[in-house]
Amino acid sequence: MPEPDHHYWMNRAIDLSRLSPQVPGAFSVGAVLVVDGAEIATGYSRETDPKVHAEESALDKLDPHDPRLRRAALYSTLEPCSERATRTRLPCTDRVLAAGIPVVVIAWREPSTFVENCVGVEKLQQHGVRVVELPELADAAMAVNRHLDLS
C-alpha cells in the first residue's frame, strides 16, 4: 500500500481550521480522518459547540466502533491534547486511543499557551500510535492562530 499524501490531507485540515470561530482562549484546529486514501470524517474547533475540539468533532461523526477507525490516519493541524481545560471532556489523545486509530499526522506541537507541557505525541507513541510530524506545514497551521499569543 503506498504512503498516503500527507501534505494533501494536512492542507485539507488547514483549510478546515479556517472555519473555526476565532476566540481568545482557544486554538483554531482542523482535523481529517482518512482511510485508504478517502476522507471519512472531518472536524474543526468549535464546529458543533464552543468547547468542541477538531479531533473530537470528526470522531463524533462516526460510530465509535466503526471498524475503519482501526485503519485510519488522523490529520490534525495541532498535536492532539493530552489534557483538557474542560474537565468534563476526554482529552483528544484518549479519544484517539479508544478509537484504535494507528496513525496521527500533525503540523505542529501544542505550545504552552493554555496547557503546560502537552504530551499528546508522547502519550500516543507510548501506546503504539505512529505519529508523523510535518514541520514544513507548521507555519501554515500556526497562521490560522495569529489571534493568540504563541510565544
Segments (PLM) and residue ranges:
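Short beta-strand scaffold segments in enzyme catalytic cores
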Residues: 28-37
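Secondary-structure boundary/capping residues
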Residues: 22, 26, 67-68
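Short, basic/aromatic recognition patches
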Residues: 2-24
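Zn2+-dependent cytidine deaminase-like catalytic core
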Residues: 41-141
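Short, basic and Ser/Thr-rich N-terminal targeting/leader segments
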Residues: 25-29, 52
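Short, surface-exposed amphipathic charged segments that create phosphate/polyanion-binding patches used
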Residues: 121, 144-151
